[in-house]
């Protein structure tokens, strides 16, 4: 079963007038992981798609998606898949890939139908691609590791870069995930924006009762979302994206836009936030 929800782009002047329900309706990515289903959110920010596939032992195939108006979803798109569950498989073209928990699979444009199987919980990201590039399976051990933060500032963390120029080639998609060390709660501090790219977060590995306070909005007009396990946030190019957790968590970040330069960001110091 395939379900697709469309999210329109929101400008910052309108966003700052929204109440809690309105903010969650536009920017919270939830209800993406249902057993036996593929559920996608099609955003108008760089035509980025995020979603989940939970085969639960019965294969699920993603092929034609009406919103793209192409014969197959990946005809003019690339895809990044992260397995946040148990071991599963992804088949595309004539190849089948085994993904353990934490593995990332990149599929280039023209990969045709994609089939998910096994016990995996697959997080899907996708954006338009101008050329076809080879598929690549990247394990945590093969990712580029970057240490940031400090215990004193409660933001000591490891950034693992997977779909990234230092690891592999993609067209527009950049993806990785960040793991916080014990005792640290803050991610992406100092905050930043990048007007050249949108970004999406997925928070996972959280206790049922735990929440992440996700900060968003223009630096002078910040807002917040309380986010549960396996929920995410859609971050427009004009918005900061930071958060603090009540308990441990990991988050997947994915970006699409004008470039794939991870360092292309404009930092906002805490004293400049309102």
UniProtKB/Swiss-Prot annotation:
Transmembrane segments: none annotated. One of its GO terms (molecular function) is zinc ion binding. Its cofactor is Zn(2+). It comes from the Bacteria. Binds 1 zinc ion per subunit. CDD domains: cupin_KduI_C (cd20491), cupin_KduI_N (cd20294). Its EC number is 5.3.1.17. It catalyses: 5-dehydro-4-deoxy-D-glucuronate = 3-deoxy-D-glycero-2,5-hexodiulosonate. Keywords: Isomerase, Metal-binding, Zinc. Signal peptide: none annotated. One of its GO terms (biological process) is D-glucuronate catabolic process. The keyword Oxidoreductase does not apply. SUPFAM superfamilies: RmlC-like cupins (SSF51182). Zn(2+) binds at residues 192, 194, 199, 241. Pathway: Glycan metabolism; pectin degradation; 2-dehydro-3-deoxy-D-gluconate from pectin: step 4/5. InterPro entries: KduI, KduI/IolB_isomerase, KduI_N, RmlC-like_jellyroll, RmlC_Cupin_sf. Catalyzes the isomerization of 5-dehydro-4-deoxy-D-glucuronate to 3-deoxy-D-glycero-2,5-hexodiulosonate. PANTHER family: 4-DEOXY-L-THREO-5-HEXOSULOSE-URONATE KETOL-ISOMERASE. Belongs to the KduI family. NCBIfam families: PRK00924.1. This is 4-deoxy-L-threo-5-hexosulose-uronate ketol-isomerase.
